[in-house]
Amino acid sequence: MSMLTIGGKSFQSRLLLGTGKYPSFDIQKEAVAVSESDILTFAVRRMNIFEASQPNFLEQLDLSKYTLLPNTAGASTAEEAVRIARLAKASGLCDMIKVEVIGCSRSLLPDPVETLKASEQLLEEGFIVLPYTSDDVVLARKLEELGVHAIMPGASPIGSGQGILNPLNLSFIIEQAKVPVIVDAGIGSPKDAAYAMELGADGVLLNTAVSGADDPVKMARAMKLAVEAGRLSYEAGRIPLKQYGTASSPGEGLPV
């Protein structure tokens, strides 16, 4: 299976894993290990990165094994997102940032205008920018024209578990993109993750599907296998859909 490359950095795993809302640090740590993810994302606002006296999941990890992807969750304007990104960079953990600017507190859908503004500013400041966006094909193109390093369209609303609601739009985004497309948000099961990869996505980012499962550790392994299977299927090339059946056995020797 080919490697994932973002901003000049290559990764073996195409599964990006979120680190929020696990039942315990121990379960979180085990799920991360089982997933074999190379990239872990976390909300800067929820991590006590400058508070040594407060519990911090990052302290439980061997950070030499992972690339950290801070996100700007909680931001509702470009200015807030930029401020959070600068805070993450000041911690010295990573220069990659997932831009997340929410425009609707109920649906948790991203604000397209503020996402564009934040992405443009952070690119000017030298960040490796991965914006979370909707499945709007034109918006994805405009983000790429800005120079972002990956596009992260949502499959469905964050944490909804509804899976891929608009595979056609995702296919259009994947087809036009010259940067990696990471399907982000709404993944509910390994089936959804495999489907995203079969569509040609370069990776999948998920959190709640694992952290909210009855057994997060088992689900983390299931997601790992699903992403691998979906990518291998895409690279192998599926058979075309046909209206009628085609025999797989040879026709020679059959009675006429």
Swiss-Prot record:
Species source reads Bacillus subtilis (strain 168)
Cite the SUPFAM superfamilies for this sequence: ThiG-like
Main enzyme class: transferase
Which purpose does this protein serve, as stated in its record?
Catalyzes the rearrangement of 1-deoxy-D-xylulose 5-phosphate (DXP) to produce the thiazole phosphate moiety of thiamine. Sulfur is provided by the thiocarboxylate moiety of the carrier protein ThiS. In vitro, sulfur can be provided by H(2)S.
Q: What is this protein called?
A: Thiazole synthase
The catalytic activity, as recorded, is:
[ThiS sulfur-carrier protein]-C-terminal-Gly-aminoethanethioate + 2-iminoacetate + 1-deoxy-D-xylulose 5-phosphate = [ThiS sulfur-carrier protein]-C-terminal Gly-Gly + 2-[(2R,5Z)-2-carboxy-4-methylthiazol-5(2H)-ylidene]ethyl phosphate + 2 H2O + H(+)
- For whether the record's keyword set contains Cytoplasm, the answer is yes
Q: Which superkingdom is the protein from?
A: Bacteria
Q: What positions does the entry give for 1-deoxy-D-xylulose 5-phosphate binding?
A: G159, A185, G186, N207, T208
GO BP terms: namely: thiamine biosynthetic process; thiamine diphosphate biosynthetic process
Q: Name one GO molecular function term.
A: thiazole synthase activity
E.C. number, please? 2.8.1.10
Q: Does the keyword Transferase apply?
A: yes
Q: Which family, according to the similarity comment?
A: Belongs to the ThiG family.
